Amino acid sequence: MPLYLKAEKIQSWRVLIMACAGFIFNTTEFVPVAMLSDIAQSFDMQTADTGLMMTVYAWTVLIMSLPAMLATGNMERKSLLIKLFIIFIVGHILSVIAWNFWILLLARMCIALAHSVFWSITASLVMRISPKHKKTQALGMLAIGTALATILGLPIGRIVGQLVGWRVTFGIIAVLALSIMFLIIRLLPNLPSKNAGSIASLPLLAKRPLLLWLYVTTAIVISAHFTAYTYIEPFMIDVGHLDPNFATAVLLVFGFSGIAASLLFNRLYRFAPTKFIVVSMSLLMFSLLLLLFSTETIIAMFSLVFIWGIGISCIGLSLQMRVLKLAPDATDVATAIYSGIFNAGIGAGALFGNLATTYLGLNEIGYTGAALGLIGFIIFITTHLKYRHTFLLQNK
């Protein structure tokens, strides 16, 4: 095998390892969605109240993303990844032995700390270790890893939780994380910090209105999604009257939609980035608006969830790629801010979903999310029209 092909194969394996790391981080972030009812029963709580686990996790990431990124900005990336995985594993061990809900929240905050740095560096890191001329495909591979978290992580986590308890689910995640950490130690090269940015980058980024409005759009649109998604399990069971096994199958469909979104992103995004985002947001709003109606038949719900998953997955990929293009001189800092704001959206969405469930009823979460999605859509369109020339320059 020619040396350049051998080197490219090794690089591809490294990208795959990072995709597996993304899988495990995304699995643990969202697996509580599939186990809210079981966790609530364990601690004798209301399901809506245990949904605040998502809020605490997300807001920990929001608060810590930028300061943690600045504190670790000059660290060699391989050693930083290893330290993050150690924190991640310790957090899951604490989750397994949590003797009350507050200890579980503390464990989730520990995991969220590792998350805050991991997702700040991962996108730019994957671009660095990927083969030449395959940067977009590498980001797509990372996206597939995160999508598989929904396909495999959430349904399997739910099944394990139902059979032997939610604590075992967190224990299995810890074991998988340990395995991935050993692969990182063995296969990843030393990676000095590069174009990470520093605290001096903040005033420069603040002078880029297109980037700032992109952050605002991200917060609102992600809030719209998680207003409904956080409570999708109790919605399907209590409102849709689905058997719990069908609820697991719906989560599986959502995950497969993430892979479809990754393929669409790889093929279509580069040709018309703005149109791609507009269509993706439209799919999200359409799905949330019709969520309640989809409970009439199983086929309707499966179809709607698939479309919903494509919409939100394409939005996440597109906005992250846009951030990287708008801040090539400070990728890690810009991505850290994006990660924090993304998780602010998750936390806000979980909170809005909780409020909608408490004061309006569980059946109203789709309408609440759709209203938020419309606000985000209007902001994005308005921003695009105002900074049209900047959009065109950034995509030349």
Swiss-Prot record:
Topology relative to the membrane: Multi-pass membrane protein
Gene3D superfamilies according to UniProt: MFS general substrate transporter like domains (1.20.1250.20)
InterPro entries: MFS, MFS_dom, MFS_Efflux_Transporters, MFS_trans_sf, Sugar_effux_transptr_put
Subcellular location: Cell inner membrane
Family as reported in the entry's similarity comment: Belongs to the major facilitator superfamily. SotB (TC 2.A.1.2) family.
Functional note: Involved in the efflux of sugars. The physiological role may be the reduction of the intracellular concentration of toxic sugars or sugar metabolites.
Entry-linked NCBIfam families: PRK03545.1
Name of this chain's protein: Probable sugar efflux transporter
Organism of provenance: Haemophilus influenzae (strain PittGG)
